[in-house]
Amino acid sequence: MVMLSWEGAMQLLLLHSSADGREKVLFGEDFPGVSDVFPSICVGDVCPDVYLEFPLIGKPFLDLTVLYRENSGKFRLDLPEAAGTEGIRDWFAGISKDYQKINFGYELDTGRRGSPAAVHFQPRGYLELVEPFCKVLGEEEKGRLYLSTAAKMPPGWKLSFFGMFRGRSGSPLRVCGYLAEGERVAVAADIERIRSVFQKIGFRAFDEKMLHQIAHVLSEAVDGADFQFDVWPNGSFGETFAIDLKLRNRRPGEMKESFNSGDRAPLRQLLEDWKIIDGRLDAALGMTFARNYPV
């Protein structure tokens, strides 16, 4: 069996993702610049986790997130969007092998190549890493903001990672965490649970309809969910509350069948009724869990 390089495997997966008309339907005009990124992000014998982020309704676009979990000691990153972050890569190289499952990386707007990338860091429970990370970036206030927000979160809502735009004075910090399974079940069963959480932490941008929607979505999130908030420099929460649903691996073709007539069909109907997705979901499902390549 021929073994591929990391870059070669990523390029093949990218080709598959864009095949059968999916490029224009899912990614719009942003797709061509993505393949140019891979030679710059496949680092030595370590390849990052790569996420293609695109909407399932509205104008198509494509964002690219790359996350590094470890450092081989041969860290090369010829990426203009990451200019000015060399210090953080050296810092991460020095500590990454001493901590489990931490990562850092970048989020690129592929429609605006050259604009500074957002920086992502996942310290998980290692809160002692937050301020050193932000200090190297010259964003000490963001580190203090993350820690003060983490201290507000109730059980079941622990923060795990965050993202920021460097050098944007007054911009919010995106904070994220994994919802504990017991908490997910409790919130899905009783909207008063999520209301009390929002009130405790000071998140105000919700109404009754939103509470019911959150409970309904979480009742379908049997494979797990994470949550996201925006936090302003003064410590107040913005108007964003997001939920990411996880989907466990299935064999090729099973995911599409699941959403069309299986256990995920109720979730699909729910999202269609709320006008969160349209027919392009079928195009996305056509590439989900469809290929793997040995490297």
Segments from the language model and where they lie:
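Extended intrinsically disordered, low-complexity coil regions enriched in Ser, Thr, Gly, Ala
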Residues: 68-93, 127-141, 183-204, 253-276
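Broad, structure-driven detector of short, well-ordered beta-strand segments within folded domains
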Residues: 39, 46-57, 100-112, 158-166, ...
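An N-terminal, globular interaction/scaffold subdomain
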Residues: 1-108
